[in-house]
Amino acid sequence: KICQDVKQSLAPCLPYVTGRAPKPA
């Protein structure tokens, strides 16, 4: 959805999807 960079790195995207991080680097 919002984090479509999962192709590059899913790790930094996980916390964003869970709602822990305001925005992935």
Swiss-Prot record:
Keyword Lyase: no
Recorded superkingdom: Eukaryota
One GO MF term attached to the UniProt entry: lipid binding
Entry keywords, A to Z: Antibiotic, Antimicrobial, Fungicide, Lipid-binding, Plant defense, Transport
Gene Ontology biological process terms, A to Z: defense response to bacterium; defense response to fungus; killing of cells of another organism
Keyword ATP-binding: no
Tissue: Seeds (at protein level).
Functional description taken from the UniProt entry: Plant non-specific lipid-transfer proteins transfer phospholipids as well as galactolipids across membranes. May play a role in wax or cutin deposition in the cell walls of expanding epidermal cells and certain secretory tissues. Has antibacterial and antifungal activity. Displays antibacterial activity towards both Gram-negative bacteria, P.carotovorum (IC(50)=11.5 uM) and P.syringae (IC(50)=12.0 uM), and Gram-positive bacterium C.michiganensis subsp michiganense (IC(50)=11.2 uM).
Recorded family membership: Belongs to the plant LTP family.
Protein name (record): Non-specific lipid-transfer protein 3
